[in-house]
Amino acid sequence: MESKAEVKADGRTERATAIRAERRAHILESAIRTFSEKGYHQTSIADIVEAAGVARGTFYLYFESKSTVFLALLDELLAHLRANVVGVEVGPGAAPLGAQLLDIVRRVLRTALEKRALADIIFREAIGLDEEVDQKLRAFYGSLHRFLMEALLMGQQGGAVRGTLDVDATASCILGSIKQVLEQYLVHTAERDFDVERFAQAIVQYNLNGVLAR
């Protein structure tokens, strides 16, 4: 049984941990605003510190550099996106493959919309920024490509997808469609309303059914 002193100490530790987490999150949110306004390369640590209203020393308690802030933001976005990519179900009672893919694409697009400012920064600034960022993006897109391939392979095994389909190339096409829609409508035309359902339907219908009348 814990003593009162131990319980009190545990409480202080929990509060300190919560405060640190809140302060770190606040710095990251301030960095998102600053990167959005100025761009990554034009933003300095001083800009982030000023936006966050913290001392420079406080910043360095949480982050080593501007690039580590960017990596933390990238990790946050990728974690949210990964959480929405779930396995495809097969067998009796499972929803049709198209419906399952639609649900996954819909949730990925919705997550990007909810994290729009962050997604905007990643798409505008991440490519070619440094090797670690490139590795993280390659790993994420690679995992999403493998997931799509596996879903199509299961569709072939279940008879929902034709056996002659090149699942590797098709998975790349689906992934490319998602990336292009996000880049075009969340970044380059950010002032437009982004209709998640419209684009999720278009991505899945185009990649699974094509455009020719049947």
Language-model segments: residues:
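C-terminal peripheral helix-coil segments that are non-catalytic and often amphipathic
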Residues: 1-10, 106-110, 114, 146, ...
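Basic, helix-initiating cap at the start of DNA-binding domains
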Residues: 1-38, 43-54, 68
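An amphipathic alpha-helix adjacent to DNA-recognition modules
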Residues: 21-29, 41-42, 53, 62-86, ...
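Amphipathic alpha-helical segments enriched in hydrophobic/aromatic and basic residues
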Residues: 35, 44-45, 55-59, 66, ...
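Hydrophobic alpha-helical connector segments
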Residues: 72, 86-117, 167, 171-174, ...
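Amphipathic alpha-helical packing segments from all-alpha helical-bundle domains
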Residues: 79-86, 111, 131-158, 168-172, ...
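Amphipathic alpha-helical segments used for helix-helix packing
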Residues: 100, 113-132, 180-187
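Short, hydrophobic secondary-structure boundary micro-motifs
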Residues: 120-122, 160, 164
